[in-house]
Amino acid sequence: KIFERCELARTLKNLGLAGYKGVSLANWVCLAKWESNYNTRATNYNPGSKSTDYGIFQINSRYWCNDGKTPRAVNACHISCSALLQDDITQAVACAKRVVSDPNGIRAWVAWRAHCENRDVSQYVRNCGV
């Protein structure tokens, strides 16, 4: 599923991400824009670590989910990576909450550091009624 910007903002708010661990809703929408272009089915393989990033938040199989093929995988979210590709993003959001609970917080995501950090992210929720 490819979310429309405001549809995603409303969904993330309903799933409790607004202000979670101090991260604003606009920052989460910015993250999703630059990681997956709002696409729940997005996958990207990382040859160096032989790991894959999954879903709207591009959550990595080395640490967070199990895809059955990543060496030394940790599976800290206790989830199948395929669950992160569903149209229903409830499980992806739950895992993102686990990721952002680590000391690195939202900085765990390279795309957030590159495109959202220290920027005006208000545009990502503008006119969304959230």
Swiss-Prot record:
<feature type="domain" description="C-type lysozyme">
    <location>
        <begin position="1"/>
        <end position="130"/>
    </location>
</feature>
<feature type="disulfide bond">
    <location>
        <begin position="6"/>
        <end position="128"/>
    </location>
</feature>
<feature type="disulfide bond">
    <location>
        <begin position="77"/>
        <end position="95"/>
    </location>
</feature>
<feature type="active site">
    <location>
        <position position="35"/>
    </location>
</feature>
<dbReference type="InterPro" id="IPR001916">
    <property type="entry name" value="Glyco_hydro_22"/>
</dbReference>
<comment type="function">
    <text>Lysozymes have primarily a bacteriolytic function; those in tissues and body fluids are associated with the monocyte-macrophage system and enhance the activity of immunoagents.</text>
</comment>
<dbReference type="InterPro" id="IPR000974">
    <property type="entry name" value="Glyco_hydro_22_lys"/>
</dbReference>
<dbReference type="GO" id="GO:0050829">
    <property type="term" value="P:defense response to Gram-negative bacterium"/>
</dbReference>
<dbReference type="InterPro" id="IPR019799">
    <property type="entry name" value="Glyco_hydro_22_CS"/>
</dbReference>
<feature type="disulfide bond">
    <location>
        <begin position="30"/>
        <end position="116"/>
    </location>
</feature>
<dbReference type="GO" id="GO:0031640">
    <property type="term" value="P:killing of cells of another organism"/>
</dbReference>
<keyword id="KW-0326">Glycosidase</keyword>
<dbReference type="Pfam" id="PF00062">
    <property type="entry name" value="Lys"/>
</dbReference>
<dbReference type="InterPro" id="IPR023346">
    <property type="entry name" value="Lysozyme-like_dom_sf"/>
</dbReference>
<comment type="similarity">
    <text>Belongs to the glycosyl hydrolase 22 family.</text>
</comment>
<feature type="active site">
    <location>
        <position position="53"/>
    </location>
</feature>
<dbReference type="GO" id="GO:0003796">
    <property type="term" value="F:lysozyme activity"/>
</dbReference>
<keyword id="KW-0378">Hydrolase</keyword>
<feature type="disulfide bond">
    <location>
        <begin position="65"/>
        <end position="81"/>
    </location>
</feature>
<dbReference type="GO" id="GO:0050830">
    <property type="term" value="P:defense response to Gram-positive bacterium"/>
</dbReference>
<keyword id="KW-1015">Disulfide bond</keyword>
<protein>
    <recommendedName>
        <fullName>Lysozyme C, spleen isozyme</fullName>
        <ecNumber>3.2.1.17</ecNumber>
    </recommendedName>
</protein>
<keyword id="KW-0081">Bacteriolytic enzyme</keyword>
<keyword id="KW-0929">Antimicrobial</keyword>
<comment type="subunit">
    <text>Monomer.</text>
</comment>
